[in-house]
């Protein structure tokens, strides 16, 4: 059964990115269709897969990570506008039966991702 998961690591603080808002979109005809918004838990993870089973279909998706709000809530001084406010990751799902883990490693000045397991 396929599933889509994520987690957030705050590389500036060396801690999980807890209570960070994430919005999932599916891209259909070049338009973003919102699917759900969740918040990470104390471990920087979502309580459940973002999508699983029949809900995960082949196609293009985006995850919006509200990193500016996360850092402001943590008391980090950011410029106005913030260098990174919303980090958007666009990725493709070719095999809807596979596990797609799309983590975000982030600081106020940089981010990276990879396809995890």
UniProtKB/Swiss-Prot annotation:
| Any single biological process term in GO | purine nucleobase metabolic process
**GO MF annotation: an example:** hydroxyisourate hydrolase activity
The protein's matches in SUPFAM superfamilies, at most eight in alphabetical order, are given as: Transthyretin (synonym: prealbumin)
| Domain of life, source organism | Bacteria
- Reaction catalysis annotation: 5-hydroxyisourate + H2O = 5-hydroxy-2-oxo-4-ureido-2,5-dihydro-1H-imidazole-5-carboxylate + H(+)
The Enzyme Commission number assigned here is: 3.5.2.17
Residue ranges spanning the membrane: these are: none
Q: Which CDD domains does the entry link to?
A: TLP_HIUase (cd05822)
Q: Does the keyword Cell membrane apply?
A: no
tRNA processing in keyword set: no
Q: Which family does it belong to?
A: Belongs to the transthyretin family. 5-hydroxyisourate hydrolase subfamily.
Quaternary state and partners of this protein?
Homotetramer.
Q: Supply any other comment.
A: HIU hydrolysis also occurs spontaneously, but more slowly.
| Record's function text | Catalyzes the hydrolysis of 5-hydroxyisourate (HIU) to 2-oxo-4-hydroxy-4-carboxy-5-ureidoimidazoline (OHCU).
Q: What is this protein called?
A: 5-hydroxyisourate hydrolase
What species does this protein belong to? Ralstonia nicotianae (strain ATCC BAA-1114 / GMI1000)
- Species classification: Bacteria, Pseudomonadati, Pseudomonadota, Betaproteobacteria, Burkholderiales
């Amino acid at each position: 059964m396929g599933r889509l998961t994520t987690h957030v690591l705050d590389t500036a603080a060396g801690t999980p990115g807890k209570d960070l808002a994430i919005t999932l979109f599916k891209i259909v005809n070049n338009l973003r269709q919102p699917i759900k918004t969740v918040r990470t838990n104390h471990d920087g993870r979502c309580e459940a897969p973002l999508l699983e089973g029949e809900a995960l279909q082949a196609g293009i998706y985006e995850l919006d990570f509200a990193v500016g709000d996360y850092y402001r809530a943590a008391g980090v001084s950011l410029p106005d506008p913030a260098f990174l406010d919303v980090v958007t990751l666009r990725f493709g799902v070719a095999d809807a039966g596979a596990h797609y883990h799309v983590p975000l490693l982030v600081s106020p000045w940089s981010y990276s991702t990879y396809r995890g397991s």
